[in-house]
From Swiss-Prot:
It comes from the Eukaryota. The keyword ATP-binding does not apply. PROSITE patterns: ZN2_CY6_FUNGAL_1 (PS00463), ZN2_CY6_FUNGAL_2 (PS50048). The keyword DNA-binding applies. GO terms for molecular function: DNA-binding transcription factor activity, RNA polymerase II-specific; transcription cis-regulatory region binding; zinc ion binding. The lineage of its organism: Eukaryota, Fungi, Dikarya, Ascomycota, Pezizomycotina. Belongs to the prtT family. Keywords: DNA-binding, Metal-binding, Nucleus, Transcription, Transcription regulation, Zinc. GO terms for biological process: positive regulation of DNA-templated transcription; protein catabolic process; regulation of DNA-templated transcription; regulation of protein catabolic process. One of its GO terms (cellular component) is nucleus. The gene is prtT. This is Transcriptional activator of proteases prtT.
Length: 696
């Protein structure tokens, strides 16, 4: 740039000097013509506005030999001519282009700069480089060579940089793209047909594999448990899209089947059950005993249905709604072991008959009736001599009655304020939802409560009167919902996961409240996964670990608290004990739990007594069945000899203290006359000794 400016200054000064020479008729040196030729050939460097005096040099320029082969200047009318000289005439200025440059250059304006013609016939000099017009945008910006195949779709640089190669659209490329898309469009139908065929084949293969698994006659390996093998004969219909899984374990049904098998009872109701009258009006239970039973019920069971005072269940209620009054006395009878079994049995049959009549009564049902139905759903096995009431059916029908009777269920949860009356209804509603969930997952049955109704359950915790037990019920509802969803998700069960993100999130908020239910749900999920992974040692270890945690926790429970447990707790403990019998029958926790259950049972019809007997019989069969030499191979591969004598030192002291515990219960009914407690206390010792002899 500096050289160009210097050239301009020198040229202007020299031209001015030579103008003075011409005006004085002096000779013009040859270098002046060289400068003029330079200006003619390089118009951008020497502007015509800065060397205006050259216009007056017409005489010496036109025929000078220096300009031969260069552009010849003929000047048109110029506005600067009069200013430069008064004697010199001005002619048109035109550019004559050399022969090699053709005639396709026009003068666009007075600047003298040529412009290319729009035609494509320009003849270029032989030595000039012709650049490719197919370079991509990236190579153009980098000013590098674009290594592109004429029919390619990206250059090497863009491929190596993993960026999009943007190419200018040409006629050839457009034709190539059009042909490529036409070929792809023509191939789409055939691809879709092949995909449909592959999907159909995969579906057939999957169904065939399931049938092969279901029809497998035997499973190798000693770690395959008896409970797992018993599930092979269950319904094996497809579980995809269903609301209940045929592969899920059924603890409640399992216990009922085992109990019927071991005891040999018919599990049918007596024919005269419908002709039973009112036990209270007939004087079978005297008024003093009934008052004590109501007090015991309020102390241990009233929290479930918002009954805080015996006056809430007054004597007039026995005439207006005998179902709640009779249910309260039946549940409280477990705290009075001296009540004859015949009386308890008669009460139970009367309540069953009244329940059947109530369920088909005209709607809406009274609040007290719904309270009684919720209690019966929580404790359906109060008497185990006959087939217990089906908690899933009972709670399901009761929920339908509650939807009709409880008006708040027909509104959005945010539309209403939780008051005292709504608290009492919410407690009954939560109890019904919980029992429906427990029985659905315990029997592998569908769960049909809509989500908009379940959203009302946690609203109970918004009221200041909400208790610790209310929080546990809400947490347990959420836990069983998660477990039921995972159990019905067959893909998750087939993967054999050992940790579930949904349960881990639940633990962060509620794990400190519910231990037994958490371990029970994990146990059910592991047992479900074992249907697809028969010999998974990790699953077996997790099953044993959760079973031991359940039994160890249960053995720490205080005796009065254990009697008030809902039946679901006994199913949890019993199922954990059965799993230990299945995989490790020599585990000492089995004997401890069966003795503790026997210790809790007030009579032989109680659920604890029946579960203790079932566990004892199943342990005997598991221990003696696989090996005639009484050697049992556990789930971890260790071998232990079956030796019941090792458990006798533990069992004898505990059995000796049982009568002392029952004797301590007499202070609960000090005013009861001796004739109201016949036979039971005097026969307990003989019955316990007979059972002890049987299990030892």
């Amino acid at each position: 740039m500096m050289h160009i400016q210097t050239l301009r200054k020198i040229t202007i000064l020299d031209v001015q000097d030579k103008q003075r020479c011409l005006s004085t008729n002096q000779n013009v040196p040859d270098n002046v013509f060289q400068l003029i030729a330079c200006w003619c050939y390089f118009p951008p460097f020497l502007s015509i506005a800065k060397i205006k005096p050259l216009i007056a040099l017409k005489a010496g320029i036109s025929e000078n030999p220096v300009l031969i082969g260069c552009r010849r200047i003929k000047m048109a009318h110029c506005p600067y001519s009069e200013a430069m000289t008064r004697t010199t005439s001005v002619e048109d200025v035109k550019f004559e282009i050399p022969a090699w440059d053709n005639s396709n250059v026009d003068v666009a304006d007075g600047s003298g700069r040529p412009e290319s013609s729009t035609s494509g016939d320009t003849i270029r000099p032989k030595g000039r480089i012709r650049r490719s017009m197919t370079a991509c945008n990236t190579c153009r910006k980098l000013k590098t060579r674009c290594d592109l195949d004429p029919r390619g779709h990206a250059c090497r640089r863009c491929l190596s940089l993993r960026i999009e190669c943007k190419l200018p659209e040409t006629a050839e490329r457009f034709q190539d793209n059009a042909s490529m898309w036409s070929d792809a469009t023509a191939a789409i139908p055939s691809i879709e047909e092949r995909l449909i065929s592959l999907e159909r084949s995969m579906t057939e293969m999957t169904s065939m594999m399931r049938r092969m698994m279901d029809r497998s006659p035997s499973i190798s390996g000693s770690s395959v448990s008896m409970l797992t093998r018993s599930g092979i004969t269950d319904e094996t219909a497809s579980i995809e899209g269903s609301q209940s899984s045929s592969f899920a374990p059924r603890p409640i049904r399992l216990f009922q089947d085992l109990q019927s098998d071991f005891t040999g009872e018919a599990n049918v109701l007596p024919a005269d059950s419908r002709s039973l009258g009112d036990l209270f009006t007939k004087g079978i239970i005297d008024p003093k005993l009934s008052q004590k039973l109501i007090q015991l019920f309020v102390d241990h069971f009233g929290i479930w249905i918002s009954v805080d005072n015996p006056s809430d269940i007054h004597n007039e209620l026995r005439a207006t709604d005998p179902l709640l009054y009779s249910t309260a006395c039946l549940l409280a009878s477990r705290y009075v072991p001296g009540i004859p079994l015949s009386v308890i049995h008669a009460m139970y049959l009367q309540i069953r008959h009244a329940t059947v009549n109530v369920l088909w009564n005209k709607t809406p049902l009274k609040h007290e009736t719904l309270q009684a139905l919720a209690l019966l759903a929580l404790w359906p096995t109060a008497v185990q001599k006959e087939t217990p009431m089906d908690s899933w059916l009972l709670s399901g029908i009761s929920i339908n009655h509650a939807i009709i009777s409880f008006d708040f269920l027909n509104h959005a949860p945010s539309d209403l304020i939780v008051d005292n009356d709504m608290v009492a209804k919410l407690r009954v509603w939560n109890a019904l939802c919980l029992t429906q969930l427990q029985s659905a997952i315990g029997n592998a049955r569908p769960f049909h409560i809509q989500q908009r109704y379940l959203e009302h359950c946690p609203r109970l915790l918004e009221h200041p009167a909400a208790t610790f037990e209310d929080g546990k019920i809400v947490a347990e509802i959420q836990l069983y919902l998660i477990a039921l969803k995972l159990q019905n998700f067959s893909h998750r069960m087939r993967l054999g996961d050992f940790e579930y993100e949904e349960i881990e999130r639940w633990k962060m908020e509620w794990a400190h409240l519910l231990k037994l239910s958490l371990w029970y749900c994990q146990l059910l999920l592991y047992r479900t996964a074992m249907r697809f992974h028969w010999e998974s040692e990790h699953l077996i270890s997790e099953i044993l670990r959760n079973s031991r945690l359940i039994l160890s926790k249960f053995l720490l429970v205080r005796f009065p608290n254990a009697l008030a447990f809902p039946d679901q707790i006994y199913y949890i403990v019993g199922y954990a004990a059965l799993n230990l019998c299945d995989f490790s029958p020599m585990d000492p926790l089995i004997d401890q739990v069966q003795t503790f259950l026997l210790h809790l049972s007030p009579n032989e019809d109680h659920i604890a007594y029946r579960f203790s007997y079932t566990i004892t019989e199943l342990k005997r069969r598991c221990a003696t069945g696989p090996n005639p030499h009484n050697v049992v191979k556990g789930a971890f591969g260790d071998t232990r000899k079956l030796s019941m004598g090792q458990q006798i030192p533990f069992m004898n002291p505990l059995m000796d203290t049982m009568m002392g515990e029952y004797g301590g219960l007499e202070h609960l009914i000090p005013e009861v006359p001796p004739n109201s407690l016949p036979d039971m206390l005097t026969s307990v010792a003989g019955e316990l000794q007979a059972f002890r002899t049987a299990i030892l």
